[in-house]
């Protein structure tokens, strides 16, 4: 398939318009693949389209698409991108998630520690693909002293993400510390809203600002030291 223009399908359970990580990743990967000349279609399921290659995000929730594509096209490449939910919740207890990994030609993980959650027999077909971001322009004079050391946490408030871990760690810092935590991301439940508000009440170092547009998230990231 080298130097060929491929018809590539990307399956993600996240619906169009969603700000969830899987949809954002699908859009970014599609943009990169199109820039290389390939034709890319993003869907929530696989309905028998004649793709040369299928990329499925989420081993468990995309299992039906993975199984059908493998059955209909046993010789075509099938890539399964493992999400954090796959690695740290679903794989230990879901036979379907584990079956998706066996059906894949290649597995993608986003960080090397993910290998620790995978059976050793799958390591050979697993690759780390680091997420990237466009360079930021310099927005501050580096000679101007920084009043606080700002650490930003970017991610939706979901229990599986352990979203308040940074805030809890910040509580242990000495009074002289200048560390401040700013948390960007939507709350998936009212319980998470209440937890975030409670954390702000008891922890002056922590501030949750909810879901923000992409330009604003990038701006916060640029202005953070960590």
Where do the PLM segments sit?
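Active-site proximal beta-strand in glycosyltransferases
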Residues: 53-55, 69-88, 106-109, 126-127
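Donor nucleotide-sugar binding/catalytic pocket of nucleotide-sugar-dependent glycosyltransferases
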Residues: 102-139
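Conserved donor-binding/catalytic core segment of Leloir-type glycosyltransferases
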Residues: 145-161, 167-173, 181-184
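Nucleotide-activated donor-binding/catalytic signature segment of Leloir-type glycosyltransferases, i.e.
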Residues: 185, 193-216
């Amino acid at each position: 398939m080298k130097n060929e223009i491929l018809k590539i399908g990307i399956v993600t359970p996240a619906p169009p318009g969603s700000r969830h990580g899987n949809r954002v990743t699908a859009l970014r990967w599609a943009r990169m693949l199109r820039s290389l000349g390939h034709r890319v279609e993003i869907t929530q399921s696989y309905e028998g389209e004649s793709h040369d290659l299928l990329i499925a995000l989420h081993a468990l929730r995309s299992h039906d698409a993975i199984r059908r594509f493998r059955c209909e096209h046993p010789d075509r490449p099938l890539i399964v991108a493992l999400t954090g939910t796959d690695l740290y919740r679903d794989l230990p207890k879901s036979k379907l998630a584990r079956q998706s990994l066996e059906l894949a030609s290649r597995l993608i993980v986003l960080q090397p520690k993910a290998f620790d959650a995978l059976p050793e027999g799958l390591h050979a077909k697993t690759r780390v693909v680091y997420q990237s971001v466009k360079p930021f322009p310099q927005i501050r004079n580096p000679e101007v002293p920084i009043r606080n050391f700002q650490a930003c946490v970017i991610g939706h408030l979901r229990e599986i993400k352990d979203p308040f871990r940074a805030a809890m760690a910040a509580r242990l810092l000495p009074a002289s510390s200048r560390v401040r935590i700013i948390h960007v991301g939507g709350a998936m439940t009212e319980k998470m809203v209440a937890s975030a508000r409670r954390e702000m009440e008891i922890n002056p170092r922590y501030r949750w600002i909810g879901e923000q547009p992409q330009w604003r998230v990038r701006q916060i990231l640029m202005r953070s030291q960590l």
